[in-house]
Amino acid sequence: HSTAWALLGVGDEDFDPEALRRLRELLSTGGVPLVAELWSQSPDFTLPGALWRVYLFREWFHRDPLTVADLYILGLHAEQVPGLEEPIHARPLEDVIHDADALLSGEKRDDDLEDIFTELAHAMRIVAAGDPRVGRQWIDDPHDALAYGVTMRARALVMTAQELERAASRARIGELD
């Protein structure tokens, strides 16, 4: 929990200003996977759990941007995107990912969490609607570096979107642990 809050510039007894500076330096030099691994076992209703889900989606996009972008475009043109009202007003996927990158590099604050989590949840729902194999796992290969319970469950994108929406709601009312 301390590293997740420190990422947002919120120190505690474990993270004084110097420790915050070092963490941000680690993140800016490619240390996000190391820190994100610490969050992988955290429940979805906590900040580290939500950040873990942000990290996984962002990594999938950076690894396979064409596939994710194609599914996003297909989803935008789907007859229905479960969980989103019509008409769909969605930001460009690249902008949503840019915000995720900024969040995970320590450039955002806790006031930004609700919007970022909500936008990422919308993006996940849109990508899921663009996938003709609805109900499939997000990551199919158990040896994939992104293969975790979150990504290998049936309907992973929709379920992860729901979890991020819950985290956004908790962030809005100041109850995100």
Model-derived segments and spans:
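Short, well-ordered helical secondary-structure segments
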Residues: 15-19, 44, 144, 151
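Helix-driven interaction modules
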Residues: 71-168
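Generic amphipathic alpha-helical segments used as scaffolds and interaction surfaces in large
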Residues: 10, 23-26, 44, 87, ...
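Leu/Val/Ala/Ile-rich N-terminal alpha-helices, chiefly Sec-type signal peptides and the beginnings
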Residues: 1-29, 34-36
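Long, charge-patterned amphipathic interaction tracts in eukaryotic proteins
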Residues: 15, 25, 33-99
